């Protein structure tokens, strides 16, 4: 006589959590941090079409790691929810906290009720409306629906421990944009699995900001020459090193 296979609820939750954590850890890292004029998103992402960072609404941004199809569905659903709320009520009624709570409820339901949890981790950020003075809000939402507000920065995906340790040492409140980009990129470069420090350039970075000084839509991507201009020393050092390598020994 064969007995039906039984697994305790505790073991089932542990296995779901392990599956989700492993999937998230395989992804490349994303950093979101508050700076003087809003929120900066920096993602290690060589793809120009599969984006990890996007706008959700006028003053709200989104970043994610994990399975692209899963977090892209969540991103699209969040945009539809925000548009519906803004149309039915007021655009100012759509907040980052509201969207973070919706994502937390959705991921919590998926984690407990569906056969497989989503292998994703999300960040929802909001800046103050134009002319208002309010600190940026950063929310981290994990695969099981847990939600936490972070005062300064959020690190997701990949090897997060060295990146967090680097940011704990180097993060500065109210930094200018160029300084904030340097801090975030330096932290991402410390997150490799190997012993050697990696070098990340414009071709491997996805960078965007929520700029509180913009009148309505705060989200703006930084690409091409604008991104290169934020990393002048890095480019100059690379050119100097290349020139030294090409120069024959005397």
Swiss-Prot record:
The keyword Cytoplasm applies. GO terms for biological process: modification-dependent protein catabolic process; proteasomal protein catabolic process. Its main location: cytoplasm. One of its GO terms (molecular function) is threonine-type endopeptidase activity. SUPFAM superfamilies: N-terminal nucleophile aminohydrolases (Ntn hydrolases). Pathway: Protein degradation; proteasomal Pup-dependent pathway. It comes from the Bacteria. Keywords: Cytoplasm, Proteasome. The keyword Metal-binding does not apply. GO terms for cellular component: cytoplasm; proteasome core complex, alpha-subunit complex. It is found in: Cytoplasm. The formation of the proteasomal ATPase ARC-20S proteasome complex, likely via the docking of the C-termini of ARC into the intersubunit pockets in the alpha-rings, may trigger opening of the gate for substrate entry. Interconversion between the open-gate and close-gate conformations leads to a dynamic regulation of the 20S proteasome proteolysis activity. Belongs to the peptidase T1A family. PANTHER family: PROTEASOME SUBUNIT ALPHA/BETA. The 20S proteasome core is composed of 14 alpha and 14 beta subunits that assemble into four stacked heptameric rings, resulting in a barrel-shaped structure. The two inner rings, each composed of seven catalytic beta subunits, are sandwiched by two outer rings, each composed of seven alpha subunits. The catalytic chamber with the active sites is on the inside of the barrel. Has a gated structure, the ends of the cylinder being occluded by the N-termini of the alpha-subunits. Is capped by the proteasome-associated ATPase, ARC. Component of the proteasome core, a large protease complex with broad specificity involved in protein degradation. This is Proteasome subunit alpha. It comes from Mycobacterium sp. (strain KMS). The lineage of its organism: Bacteria, Bacillati, Actinomycetota, Actinomycetes, Mycobacteriales. The gene is prcA.
């Amino acid at each position: 006589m064969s007995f039906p296979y039984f697994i305790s609820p505790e073991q089932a939750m542990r296995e779901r959590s392990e599956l989700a954590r492993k999937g998230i850890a395989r992804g490349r890292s994303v950093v979101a941090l508050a700076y003087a004029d809003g929120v900066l998103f920096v993602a290690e992402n060589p793809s120009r079409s599969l984006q990890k960072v996007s706008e959700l609404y006028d003053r709200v941004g989104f970043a994610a790691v994990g399975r692209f199809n899963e977090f892209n569905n969540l991103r699209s659903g969040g945009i539809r929810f925000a548009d519906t709320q803004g149309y039915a009520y007021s655009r100012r009624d759509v907040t980052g906290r509201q969207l973070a709570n919706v994502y937390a409820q959705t991921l919590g339901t998926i984690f407990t009720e569906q056969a497989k949890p989503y292998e994703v981790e999300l960040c929802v950020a909001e800046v103050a409306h134009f002319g208002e003075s309010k600190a940026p809000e950063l929310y981290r939402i994990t695969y099981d629906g847990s939600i936490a507000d972070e005062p300064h920065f959020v690190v997701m995906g990949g090897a997060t421990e060295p990146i967090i340790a680097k940011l704990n040492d180097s993060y500065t409140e109210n930094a200018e944009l160029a300084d904030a980009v340097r801090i975030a990129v330096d932290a991402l470069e410390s997150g490799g699995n190997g012993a050697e420090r990696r070098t990340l350039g414009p071709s491997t970075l996805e960078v965007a900001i929520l700029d509180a000084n913009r009148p309505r839509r705060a989200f703006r991507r930084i690409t091409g020459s604008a991104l290169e201009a934020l990393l002048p020393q890095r480019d100059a050092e690379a050119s100097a090193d290349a020139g030294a390598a090409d120069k024959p020994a005397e």
